[in-house]
């Protein structure tokens, strides 16, 4: 059975929305009057991005500032284990990775050059700096996703293997963010913090 591109995006939307395990009220996204009507690709994809932003910003705010340098170690899981944890990102590193990835992926979606502020985002250390940078990266991402139109949503992006259209790349960027969101939730729990999505 062949699945259309729009069906694939719809299925991905459902899968990603379900990944958080929480019912959310994302105001100003979909309304009852939208049911059964075509929706612009940018609007549909932006809903996914809004959901991710809500989840990521929630965990970023929930972690105490003094725990931003936390990273799991072998001792966290199995003392004496031969597993190597030397390259595991800290909580701060996970968040700056998401911010940097937002700039990278969404600049490819639109063809825009990322702003100068994106260059040093991975070097930020404090909670306040990281929260501000993360928020800016999501604002940039929302602006770039709005460049997706019915006409260009599935046009090939030259030189980009794997995720080669604006729509599929935008969807992948959200999926990538949820991968790291899941890790951030575990970091919170390892530090006795209940993730906002579980309240």
Role assignments for model-derived ranges:
Residues 7-18:
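Bacterial N-terminal signal peptides
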Residues 23-30, 34, 42, 46, ...:
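Short, contiguous alpha-helical
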Residues 1-5:
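Positively charged n-region of N-terminal signal peptides that target proteins for export
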Residues 48, 122-157, 166-180:
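Acidic/histidine-rich alpha-helical segments that form the ligand environment
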Residues 52, 59, 101, 134-137, ...:
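Amphipathic alpha-helices that form helix-helix packing interfaces
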Residues 23-26, 65, 114, 143, ...:
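Low-complexity, Gly/Pro
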């Amino acid at each position: 059975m062949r699945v259309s591109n729009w069906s694939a995006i719809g299925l991905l939307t459902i899968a990603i929305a379900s990944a958080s395990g929480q019912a959310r009220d994302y105001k100003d996204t979909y309304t009852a009057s939208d049911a059964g009507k075509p929706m612009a690709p940018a609007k549909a994809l932006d809903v996914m991005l809004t959901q991710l932003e809500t989840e990521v910003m929630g965990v970023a705010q929930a972690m105490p500032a003094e725990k931003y340098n936390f990273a799991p170690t072998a001792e966290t899981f199995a003392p004496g284990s031969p597993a190597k944890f030397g390259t595991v990102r800290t909580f701060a590193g996970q968040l700056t990775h998401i911010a940097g990835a937002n700039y990278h992926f969404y600049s490819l979606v639109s063809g825009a050059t990322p702003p100068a502020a994106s260059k040093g985002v991975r070097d930020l250390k404090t909670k306040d700096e990281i929260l501000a940078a993360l928020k800016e990266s999501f604002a940039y991402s929302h602006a770039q996703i709005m460049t997706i139109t019915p006409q260009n949503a599935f046009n090939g992006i030259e030189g980009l293997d794997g995720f080669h259209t604006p729509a599929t790349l935008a969807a992948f960027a959200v999926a990538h963010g949820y991968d790291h969101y899941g890790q951030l939730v575990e970091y919170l729990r390892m530090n006795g913090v209940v993730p906002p999505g579980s309240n």
